From Swiss-Prot:
Gene encoding the protein: rsxD
Lineage: Bacteria, Pseudomonadati, Pseudomonadota, Gammaproteobacteria, Enterobacterales
Post-translational modification FMN phosphoryl threonine, affected residues: T187
Main location: membrane
Keywords: Cell inner membrane, Cell membrane, Electron transport, Flavoprotein, FMN, Membrane, Phosphoprotein, Translocase, Transmembrane, Transmembrane helix, Transport
Function: Part of a membrane-bound complex that couples electron transfer with translocation of ions across the membrane. Required to maintain the reduced state of SoxR.
Entry EC no(s): 7.-.-.-
Any Pfam family the entry gives: NQR2_RnfD_RnfE
Record protein name field: Ion-translocating oxidoreductase complex subunit D
Subcellular location: Cell inner membrane
Highest taxon listed in the record's lineage: Bacteria
InterPro entries tied to this protein: NqrB/RnfD, RnfD_bac
Subunit text: The complex is composed of six subunits: RsxA, RsxB, RsxC, RsxD, RsxE and RsxG.
Cofactor: FMN
């Protein structure tokens, strides 16, 4: 009898990286569809720009490194990076912004570290943060959902705004951002933070058109529920583990509830946190990145909980309305430490 000697791991996941990435791309369809419905064609244009930029940037670096271009591009990781960045930025952001952010994400945040599996930080979130810090006005210029918008740009106007900055009739972002109350609109999280700092009461803030949704912000609640649906499908397909999304959402909900109970005049209610911004996108599609997240089950719970706490702290007390990207990157920093203290004990090895 022949005994085969091999190093660990002794159990293997038969799914290839490309298939897992493809499952994540498919799971993003509900979220993309919801953003298209409420915010127009811009999301689709940004996805196309980001996808092409990601593939070209990755191909260029692979060519310079004398590595197989076709084999690496087939893993779909570049496409996923581009998609996650594209759905995170305003749909009418200038074309060069998504190109710049995607190229930075792929070349600097991913390939500079050695490529897929070597990068310590989520590339899409690195690209997003670079854009947010460099171009804060453009990165916070979201359109109002169509249900409260005065001007809804068509496909041609969308293309013209993205590539030239104005519509065929001469309209610009200022006119497109007007809501039914005649006031330029922002996201629910941005509106809440700005209004509280301006001295408005929570009761007044909740009367704004942006909060006319059944559960939370108009449009944004359905976008988050769509990303949640995609995330649940990923769990059902066993493409991701449940530990990170659950601990993230539970921690965020717990912190938001406690904060709201103790300070209802200054802090947002839990449903605003859970169903606004990039909450569900972050929980199921960004934090669960297998390369930059913790690799142990206990570590995943800690990692998700830490990210949830950071999101609430940044949203409630920080300078930015949504803290998902910063929370992800800060949590990424702690992964080596978390994995070190949560690694499974070797069989037969005693504690201490």
């Amino acid at each position: 009898m022949v005994f085969r000697i091999a190093s660990s791991p002794y159990t293997h996941n038969q799914r290839q990286t490309s298939r897992i990435m493809l499952l994540v791309l498919l799971a993003a369809v509900p979220g993309i569809a919801a953003q298209l419905w409420f915010f127009g064609w811009g999301t689709l244009v940004q996805i196309l720009l980001a996808s092409v930029s990601a593939l070209l940037a990755e191909a260029l670096v692979l060519k310079l490194r004398k590595q197989s271009v076709a084999a690496t591009l087939k893993d779909n990781s570049a496409l996923l990076t581009g998609l996650l960045l594209a759905v995170s930025i305003p749909p009418l952001a200038p074309w060069w912004m998504v190109v710049l952010g995607t190229v930075f994400a792929v070349i600097i945040a991913k390939q500079l570290y050695g490529g897929l599996g070597q990068n310590p930080f989520n590339p899409a979130m690195i690209g997003y943060v670079v854009l947010l810090i460099s171009f804060p006005v453009q990165m916070t210029s979201w359109l109002p959902p169509h249900e409260i918008a005065v001007n809804i740009p068509g496909f041609i106007d969308t293309i013209q705004v993205i590539f030239s900055g104005h519509t065929a009739s001469g309209g610009d972002m200022n006119t497109l951002r007007l809501g039914i109350d005649g006031i330029s609109q922002a996201t629910p999280l941005d509106t809440f933070k700005t209004s509280v700092r301006a001295g408005h009461s929570v009761e007044e803030i909740m009367q704004y058109p942006i909060y006319s949704g059944i559960l939370a912000g108009a449009g944004w609640q359905w976008v988050n529920l769509a990303w949640l649906a995609g995330g649940v499908w990923l769990l059902w397909q066993k493409a991701i583990r449940w530990h990170i999304p659950l601990s993230f959402l539970v921690t965020l909900a717990l912190c938001a509830t406690l904060g709201w109970l103790f300070s209802p005049d200054t802090l947002a209610a839990p449903q605003i946190h859970l169903l606004s911004g990039a909450t569900m996108l972050g929980a199921f599609f960004i934090l669960t990145d297998p390369v930059t997240a913790s690799t142990t089950n206990r570590g995943r719970l800690i990692f998700g909980a830490l990210a949830g706490l950071l999101v609430w702290l940044i949203r409630s007390f920080g300078g930015y309305p949504d803290g998902v990207a910063f929370a992800v990157l800060l949590a990424n920093i702690t992964v080596p430490l978390i994995d070190y203290y949560t690694r499974p004990r070797v069989y037969g090895h005693r504690k201490g």
